[in-house]
């Protein structure tokens, strides 16, 4: 059985860095989809955790390589297609303490979730419920308050530091923006 020899630790602050795709070949290799900015960075953060049947398991990366357009991985103890297929669609999770400290002005998406977004004039635009990548910049998806004066349900505000985003205060969970509340 996989993972028996490892004491299953639990990531204190789980962060999803990617997910496992379909099996590749017959020796237990799997495709991997990385959501890190540079796809290969996902291999820098170890150990990986996965959740199966509501249990955390630590998995050990044995090796990885490029194959055509894909990244494929070999996990320790996963030696055939059947074992690999059990992991398809499992999210790859690390503890946030394994991630590098960010530079000023950079934030992890997970830290912005649930933040209250207000304009410089003090108008409450709502709460961050999601983030979107548009290619040129990230976009905050903000769920407006029930009694929004403009009758808006959801706002999309570009995460442009300095230009739109004036201040991010993670201690008070607020983001101050220069944005017209009518949008």
UniProtKB/Swiss-Prot annotation:
InterPro entries: PRC_barrel-like_sf (IPR011033), PRC_RimM (IPR056792), RimM (IPR011961), RimM_N (IPR002676), RimM_N_sf (IPR036976), Transl_B-barrel_sf (IPR009000). Pfam families: PRC_RimM, RimM. Keywords: Chaperone, Cytoplasm, Ribosome biogenesis, rRNA processing. It is found in: Cytoplasm. Its main location: cytoplasm. The keyword Cytoplasm applies. GO terms for biological process: ribosomal small subunit biogenesis; rRNA processing. One of its GO terms (cellular component) is cytoplasm. One of its GO terms (molecular function) is ribosome binding. An accessory protein needed during the final step in the assembly of 30S ribosomal subunit, possibly for assembly of the head region. Essential for efficient processing of 16S rRNA. May be needed both before and after RbfA during the maturation of 16S rRNA. It has affinity for free ribosomal 30S subunits but not for 70S ribosomes. Binds ribosomal protein uS19. The PRC barrel domain binds ribosomal protein uS19. PANTHER family: RIBOSOME MATURATION FACTOR RIMM. This is Ribosome maturation factor RimM. It comes from Salmonella arizonae (strain ATCC BAA-731 / CDC346-86 / RSK2980).
């Amino acid at each position: 059985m996989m993972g028996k020899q490892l004491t299953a630790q639990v990531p204190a602050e789980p962060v999803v860095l990617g997910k496992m795709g379909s099996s590749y070949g017959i020796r237990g290799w799997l495709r991997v989809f990385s959501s890190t900015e540079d796809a290969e960075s996902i291999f820098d953060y170890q150990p990986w955790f996965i959740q199966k049947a509501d249990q955390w398991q630590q998995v050990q990366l044995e090796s990885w390589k490029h194959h055509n357009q894909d990244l494929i991985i070999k996990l320790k103890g996963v030696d055939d297609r059947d074992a690999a297929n059990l992991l398809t669609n499992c999210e790859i999770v690390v503890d946030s303490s394994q991630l590098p400290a960010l530079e000023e002005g950079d934030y992890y998406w997970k830290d912005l979730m649930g933040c209250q977004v207000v304009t410089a004039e003090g108008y409450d635009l709502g709460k961050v419920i999601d983030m979107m990548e548009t290619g040129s910049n990230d976009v905050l998806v903000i769920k407006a308050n029930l009694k929004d004066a403009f009758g808006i349900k959801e706002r999309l505000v570009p995460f442009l530091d300095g230009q739109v985003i004036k201040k991010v205060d993670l201690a008070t969970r607020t983001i101050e923006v220069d944005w017209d509340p009518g949008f």
